[in-house]
Amino acid sequence: MGSKAKKRVLLPTRPAPPTVEQILEDVRGAPAEDPVFTILAPEDPPVPFRMMEDAEAPGEQLYQQSRAYVAANQRLQQAGNVLRQRCELLQRAGEDLEREVAQMKQAALPAAEAASSG
């Protein structure tokens, strides 16, 4: 048998990652309806920063920030619960799949033995 030399494929070099300034420029230049802003938009959005700057009382700012924090925290807890439930579903599905594969192997084993001895 002859030995085969593996040919290495040269891949192009990766571009340098964007700088913080480039990322900020990109985000600032994106329209408000850009998916990056709308795909995970909260149901109860926090008060925009410019409205907070216009607020008369700093206490109101703190109150609005606190409300936004509590709402975000609740959404994170709900997302965590959903992830736990989905993880459990996937684990059960994996166990079911393993059980079914084992059953299929058991069913196929006698047929294979019969074919080889016959």
UniProtKB/Swiss-Prot annotation:
Residues 81-109 form a coiled coil. The modification Phosphotyrosine is found at Y63. This is UPF0449 protein C19orf25. PANTHER family: UPF0449 PROTEIN C19ORF25. Keywords: Coiled coil, Phosphoprotein. Belongs to the UPF0449 family. It holds the Pfam family UPF0449.
